[in-house]
Amino acid sequence: NLSKADSIQDFEIKGISLGDSLLDYFTKEEILKNTYLYDNPKFSGTRIEPHDYYQNYTGMQFTYKTNDEKFILHGVSGLVNYKGIENNCVKIKEDIENQITVLFNNEQYSKRVFDTPYYELDKTGQSTVNMTEYVFDTGGSSRISCIYIKNEELKKDYYDLLRSSFQSEELVKFLSPGFIEEFEINGLSV
């Protein structure tokens, strides 16, 4: 569930916010066991799936500075794989978007919506992503995406996916001037 927020730093997914220490939720061993590095070593990430802490999600991804021993969060993503169930990703995505517009009604933001081939994972361009991105005037961004795997070969290892993510202003600036879409982790963009 989403919680009331005055700024992107106050926004929560399952009680986890930007600026929190990941150690408040997981052991150091859990974090390090699931750590991956970006192409640029300034930030690292952890993908933890599934976990009793967030039963409604198939997994969560967290981004923090590589050498930060407290694992302070600069990015939080909730993930839902749609294996074996009816894919109602668009409805859930729209519900999350509606909640964001209510929760951030006092904050100015720009919004863009697009459908595009999902080349980050599928070089054939068969798979697609439907994404809404909010960039907040006070810093930070949010993305809500439905990723549809249409390449038969990839369907063996990947599933359609809903991703709801939030990034700090520092992480957004780090990912710029290129598009955030260009950043890949195990085939999934941040």
Feature annotation, model-predicted:
Residues L2-S3:
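Cleavable N-terminal signal peptides
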Residues D6-Q9, L32-V102, E107-V190:
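Amphipathic N-proximal alpha-helical interface segments
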Residues K14-D39:
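N-terminal targeting signals for Sec/Tat export/insertion, comprising classic cleavable signal peptides
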